[in-house]
UniProtKB/Swiss-Prot annotation:
Pfam families: Fe_hyd_lg_C. [4Fe-4S] cluster 2 binds at residues 204, 259, 461, 465. This is Cytosolic Fe-S cluster assembly factor nar1. It comes from Emericella nidulans (strain FGSC A4 / ATCC 38163 / CBS 112.46 / NRRL 194 / M139) (Aspergillus nidulans). One of its GO terms (cellular component) is cytosolic [4Fe-4S] assembly targeting complex. [4Fe-4S] cluster 1 binds at residues 20, 60, 63, 66. It comes from the Eukaryota. Belongs to the NARF family. Coiled coil: none annotated. Residues 25-50, 423-446 are annotated as: Disordered. Keywords: 4Fe-4S, Iron, Iron-sulfur, Metal-binding. One of its GO terms (biological process) is iron-sulfur cluster assembly. One of its GO terms (molecular function) is iron-sulfur cluster binding.
């Protein structure tokens, strides 16, 4: 297990439940038939040494004994060691540029001998790296590309000298999620489709685990869209598999994310090729994950350290054109690696992807003259938004809830009112639901009621994704500075709260400065209207669906399910068979 996983590094960490329903089966040793009867003394009986218990990520997702992800206990194999072992286990399928910008397989390797390695990186990871090394977000991006794909990075060592053929920015697929989110909210307002209002964002896996295990009444409200990480995995595996004729099992996708919960998301049974590959259902093989491995920002440092590579000493410039492979499909290559910026990472959009902000901008574009009114809640992690018409009437209400303390308040507001068992009792509705009276707003809805929202952006970490549990901490940055600057003394004391807040502000600054780091030749986002950007994304998604011959419903959407607890229930006669079935599912044995 990675040594950097600990409860001290997590925000709003809820420790694992005392009752774990994952049974540890201890079978007696098989006795030899040569001597069925033997007389011996007690002191000569050798004590049994049971093997260490192992719990897979899939087992964790099937358990409701823990509230969130229990990162410090269960996430062991999705680490930098798994990346190194995979790179050394099988050679890389070498790819070269062909005619018309396509990519063909090098004749020196056969498809059965190796794998195609691809990686995706979130903007929060780049911001964390930029703050640590004192570089710009753009330079941090170049460092990551040089490390994963360049000749001085991973390719400089290892058994096969393998590296990653493509390194994709998750912002590209985040654009698709943003546009589809606005569509989903619009459809929910007309009552034409699920989910129920208010729609709750589903990109945070810590929040999803919490809802599935403790509050199943929340599930009808969850957005059905995949997260940018999951959508990127589906995108890469479907297109590469279709265009190059390589099975999904030969494509290995590494995702670098700001939090440990993303490891759990990658282990979800719903996020495999079984959801989109029509052939996989008839094949006896285990379904293939869309995201094979997830590491965090700090684990990226451990990965470089394991190979003896100093990240800040790598070239802070883009890879030469000769080392950059075009994506197999020209249209999708432009979408993934476009030099034009179509969205801006501003403080108004937040540090978690800007789902809520984009919904507001989309509806504002449909209502000329409207204005976005912001009202802060009890703390900085709760913000209410109202889109007001020129006449002062509310068009759309939305909110942002970050951190489990605030999430619990949101859940209480959404919880259905208890039905009284007394004969003749009135059912609590509207303003009296929950046993408390609420003031009435001008449009007739109870003021402050979350049921009045059309959309709520929910994230488990206070401050958003730049404050994820896997981000580089101020202590790590101090250690790095002490190693590379003799004038800086290493501090062993735990950082004070104000120092931690200052460090988070530094990471946020790097995150928001991503647009200012871009070249002057890059098109300003203000020249691209919201409507034009939505049309561009819709055309790209239609093209993706057409070339893969897979409906967009299977590519971009997912499902959720209630996780029932077995704690305190009597053991059923077939418990053993149930455990065997559970362990045999996708990811079993991890």
């Amino acid at each position: 297990m990675s040594a950097i996983l600990s409860a001290d590094d997590l925000n709003d960490f809820i420790s694992p439940g005392v009752a774990c329903i994952k049974p540890v089966e201890s079978l007696p040793q098989k006795q030899s038939n040569e001597n069925p009867y033997e007389v011996t003394t007690e002191d000569k009986v050798q004590p049994e040494n049971p093997p260490p218990a192992q719990i897979s990520l899939t087992d964790c997702l099937a358990c409701s004994g823990c509230v969130t992800s229990a990162e410090a206990v269960l996430i062991s194999l999705q680490s930098h060691n798994e990346v190194l072992n995979t790179l050394d286990a099988q050679p890389e399928i070498r790819l070269v540029s062909g005619e018309n910008g396509t990519v063909i397989e090098d004749s020196g390797r056969t498809r059965d001998e190796g794998r195609i390695f691809v990686a995706s990186v979130s903007p929060q990871v780049r911001a964390s790296l930029a703050a640590t090394y004192g570089v710009s977000e753009k330079e941090a991006n170049h460092i990551i590309h040089q490390f994963l794909s360049g000749p001085n990075g991973l390719r400089a060592g290892g058994k096969h000298g393998s590296g990653f053929s493509w390194v994709v920015d998750t912002n590209s697929l985040r654009e698709a999620v943003l546009v589809l989110t606005a569509d989903e909210v619009s459809e929910s307002l007309t009552g034409s489709s699920a989910p129920k209002r208010p729609i709750l964002s589903s990109a945070c896996p810590g929040w999803i685990c919490y809802a599935e295990k403790t509050h199943p009444f929340i599930l009808p409200h969850l957005s059905r869209l995949k997260s940018p990480q999951a959508l990127t995995g589906t995108f890469l595996k479907t297109v590469i598999s279709k265009k190059l004729g390589v099975p999904a099992s030969r494509i290995w996708h590494l995702s670098i994310m700001p939090c440990f919960d993303k490891k759990l998301e990658a282990s979800r049974e719903e996020l495999t090729d079984a959801a989109w590959n029509r052939l996989s259902s008839g094949e006896p093989n285990t379904p293939v994950r869309d995201v094979d491995c997830v590491i965090t920002s700090r684990e990226l440092l451990s990965l470089a350290s394991s190979r003896g590579i100093s990240l800040p000493n790598l070239p802070r410039k883009s890879l030469p054109q000769s080392l950059r492979l075009p994506f197999p499909d020209p249209a999708l290559n432009v979408f993934l690696f476009s030099e034009k910026s179509f969205s801006r990472q501003t403080s108004a959009s937040g540090t978690s992807g800007g789902y809520l902000h984009n919904v507001l901008l989309s509806f504002q574009a449909r209502n000329p003259g409207s204005e976005i009114v912001t009202q802060r809640g009890r703390n900085a992690d709760v913000v209410d938004y109202t889109l007001m018409s020129p006449e002062g009437e509310p068009i759309l209400k939305a909110a942002r809830y970050y951190g489990f303390r605030n999430i619990q308040n949101l859940v209480r507001k959404l919880k259905p009112a208890r039905v009284s068992r007394l004969p003749g009792a009135k059912v609590a509705t509207g303003q009296t639901a929950g046993g408390r009276r609420q003031p009435i707003s001008r449009n007739g809805a109870s003021a402050g009621s979350s049921m009045d929202y059309a959309y709520v952006e929910v994230m488990a970490c206070p401050g958003g994704c730049t404050n994820g549990g896997g981000q580089i901490r101020i202590g790590d940055a101090r250690e790095f500075n002490a190693q590379h600057d003799a004038s800086v003394t290493s501090e062993t004391s735990k950082p004070l709260p104000h120092e931690q807040r200052s460090w988070l502000a530094r990471v946020d600054e790097a995150y928001y400065s991503a647009d200012s780091d871009m070249d002057d030749a890059v098109e300003d986002v203000r020249t691209v209207s919201v409507t034009d950007n939505e049309d561009r994304v819709h055309k790209t998604l239609q093209h993706w669906s057409a070339i893969t011959d897979i409906p967009l419903e299977k590519l971009a959407y997912t499902t959720y399910r209630e996780v029932e607890s077995d704690v305190g229930k009597p053991s059923a006669p077939n418990d053993t068979s149930r455990v065997v079935e559970l362990a045999g599912k996708i990811g079993g044995g991890w």
